[in-house]
Structures are given as C-alpha cells and as structure tokens.
C-alpha cells in the first residue's frame, strides 16, 4: 500500500501529459463499449416474444367516447320526435269531453311526458318543454309546423267542389249543344225537300227514304231533359192562351149590342097583354060576356 501511494505521489512527467491529450484512441474505445452494452441490455419486443411462443399480437382496444345526446332540430324532427307524437296522438289519445276537463288535461300532460322521456331522457319534463319552445322559433320548425297544419285541414269540400265544377261545365256544354240541336234540325228540315207538311214531319219515320237521312242525337241525360222541359214550359207560358185585348173588347161590345135589343123586345107589351089589360072604368059598364070575351080569347073558347 505504501508503495502504491508513493507511485501515485510521484510527479507527472511529459509522457503522462501526452497521454491525457490523446483523445482519439480513448473515444473510439468508449463508443464501442457503449454500443455493445445497449444491445445487450435492450428489452425484447412483443414481436420477438410472439415469434418465439407462437402467439398472436396483442389487440389493443381503445374506447371511443360516446357523443353527448342533444335535443336539437334533427332529433325533434326525427321519427321518434314530433311525427311519432302525431301518430300516437291519433291512435291512443282520447278525451271524454265536457265535465271531464281536469282528467283530460292530466291525460294530455301524461301523454306528453311519456313522449318526451322517450325522446330525451336526460332532461326533466319542464326543462325539455323549455328547450322545445326555443327550438320552435327556428325557421325549419315553423315551416314544418305550417305543413302539418295544412295536412290536418279538411280538404273534402275542395275535392268535392272540383267534380262539381267539372260537372257544371259539362252540363253547360251539353245544354248549349242541346239548345243548338233544334236549330240545326230546323235548318236541315228547311233545306231537305218533303212532300208532306211540317206538322207530319215530327211523326213520320224517314227510314224508308234513303235521300233524307238525319243524324239522330243520343238520348239526353236527365239534366238535359229537365232543361229542355223547362225551356218548353217557359215558351208555353209566354204564349197567350186567349185573344188579344182588342179582340176581347170587340167581342164584349158585340155581346152588349146584342143584349140591348133583347131587353127592348122583352119590355114591349105583347098583344095578349094588351087584350088582357082592361080599363077599370069600363068594367062596370061592360057585360059579363064582354069581360069573358076580353079575358079568354075566342080561339080558346072553341
């Protein structure tokens, strides 16, 4: 030990100083030793382990975070939203009517609560209603609301009015055609020669006459027939039944002139009445036979 300490205590010579500054040899040796140590102490990977044991690679499962559900326009307009509410309301929701207002209101609130709980279970009923009220002010919800209201409006009257208008239009056309048919028939009757009178043309059949062929129109419907009957009745009403006023006045005057001479002739005394009339003064002077002759004619006595 003393010898070693004495060797260490010896002063450094020039050779030792040169060895200190000789870095090339020492650095290469140091770098080689560090690389070998790292290779020896390196941990074995999973691939090397699996190849040695015949096992598959380890499957790493990464759990994705589920998105938080929100009550927005898409959820409210989905099949579980307002469309479901409309369908179930038509099928399940029924009211008793007058005298059961409180029970009907409770049934309605319970119905809405169940629907909102299925749609968005994270929120309470009052909070969900507040959120739906805010969403109701958006343009998309308002347009859908108008469409739903229009769908619920009754359209039976409009659907019934369209066939009525079509029927009225067809009826007007048929009546106009029916009104034009008599004029066409008259023009055809004037143009075609007939040996018979016009009065007999309505009742004579023209099947045997090949020169005179008339297109017979089809039988009109009930509405057209009624219209034609009304037109004929109007024509009959317009025609006067009796003579005109001038002819009537003339007839009345003639009857009055005939009645006046009859009255005159009836007021004139007849010969028999003259004979029966005997003055009262001569009754006392005349004889009974004379009175008998005056009262009873001679021919009656015979």
UniProtKB/Swiss-Prot annotation:
Region (Disordered): 1-20, 34-53, 146-215, 231-274
Protein name per its UniProtKB record: Chromosome segregation in meiosis protein 3
Segments of skewed composition (Basic and acidic residues): 146-158, 231-242
Function according to Swiss-Prot or TrEMBL: Forms a fork protection complex (FPC) with tof1 and which is required for chromosome segregation during meiosis and DNA damage repair. FPC coordinates leading and lagging strand synthesis and moves with the replication fork. FPC stabilizes replication forks in a configuration that is recognized by replication checkpoint sensors.
Compartmental location: Nucleus
GO function term, MF aspect, one: DNA binding
Oligomer and partners: Component of the fork protection complex (FPC) consisting of tof1 and csm3.
GO biological-process terms attached to the record: DNA repair; DNA replication checkpoint signaling; meiotic cell cycle; replication fork arrest; replication fork processing
Family to which the UniProt record says this protein belongs: Belongs to the CSM3 family.
Keyword set, alphabetical order: Cell cycle, DNA damage, DNA repair, DNA replication inhibitor, Meiosis, Nucleus
Annotated Gene Ontology cellular component terms: replication fork protection complex
Domain of life: Eukaryota
UniProt source species: Aspergillus terreus (strain NIH 2624 / FGSC A1156)
Pfam families referenced in this protein's UniProt entry, alphabetically: Swi3
Polar residues bias (residue ranges): 34-48, 175-194
